[in-house]
From Swiss-Prot:
Coiled coil feature spans: none
Biological processes annotated in GO: DNA repair; protein ubiquitination; stalled replication fork localization to nuclear periphery; ubiquitin-dependent protein catabolic process
Organism of origin: Schizosaccharomyces pombe (strain 972 / ATCC 24843) (Fission yeast)
Name of this chain's protein: E3 ubiquitin-protein ligase complex slx8-rfp subunit rfp2
Annotated pathway: Protein modification; protein ubiquitination
Organism domain of life: Eukaryota
Taxonomy of the source species: Eukaryota, Fungi, Dikarya, Ascomycota, Taphrinomycotina
GO molecular function, one term: transferase activity
Protein's UniProt keywords contain Membrane: no
Subunit structure: Part of an E3 ubiquitin complex including rfp1, rfp2 and slx8. Interacts with slx8.
Compartment list: Nucleus
DNA damage listed as a keyword: no
A GO CC term attached to the entry: nucleus
RING-type zinc-finger residues: 147-190
Length: 205
């Protein structure tokens, strides 16, 4: 592009640009020329990476000998056992000479005592709370099962049989025969469920 004779707006004089030849070497003693360090990436570096120093076994044993052990700690102050909920528990500090067998024995005794107390309390509650008469039977080896209607002892033999209703109550063969004739309510006071011919059946003991 020829810039000679070019007139720009706002300028009275014509532009006369200065041409600089970049291919010409400039010999200037005052110019600050710094040397550039070249790094050859194709060569293997002379220095080697640092390797981890292996610690010998003797050095480790010497360091471990300085660590305090349980035997080197003086015996702490003993604390009395604390009974909580029937079990015996010891405080955070315990004597070093107490064996594990003794501690296990004390814990077993505490659990045994707590179990015995729980059984005694449950037995006393069962004795105080008894079911209403005629509602259910507390069957024990020394108790005899009786008919829910006549109260006679129920015995299963060749002459008599035991019958049961759908509600769960037991009757002798004589009372069961009367109950099977017509639909009647259960004679037990707290039951009063309807007993029909289909809802009463014999028990083979």
């Amino acid at each position: 592009m020829n810039l000679h004779g070019l007139e720009l707006p706002g300028r009275d004089q014509r532009l006369s640009p200065e041409v600089i030849d970049l291919t010409e070497d400039i010999e200037d003693d005052g110019a600050d020329v710094s040397e550039v360090t070249l790094l050859d990436l194709t060569r293997i570096p002379e220095f080697q990476p640092r390797r981890r120093i292996r610690t010998s076994r003797n050095h480790l044993d010497a360091n471990l000998s300085n660590v305090p052990t349980i035997n080197s700690i003086p015996s702490p102050v003993t604390r009395p056992p604390v009974a909580v909920g029937g079990g015996i528990f010891y405080g955070a500090r315990r004597t070093r000479n107490r064996s594990q067998t003794q501690r296990r024995t004390l814990l077993e005794n505490g659990f045994r005592n707590s179990r015995k107390k729980a059984q005694d309390s449950s037995n006393s509650i069962a004795e105080r709370v008894s079911p209403p008469p005629g509602f259910c039977y507390d069957v024990h080896p020394h108790n005899n099962i009786a008919c829910a209607k006549c109260g006679n002892e129920l015995v299963s033999d060749e002459k008599k049989s035991i019958f049961a209703a759908k509600c769960g109550h037991l009757f002798c063969s004589t009372c069961a025969k009367e109950l099977r004739k017509k639909t009647v309510p259960c004679p037990v006071q707290h039951c009063r469920k309807r007993i029909t011919k289909k809802f009463i059946f014999p028990l083979y003991l």
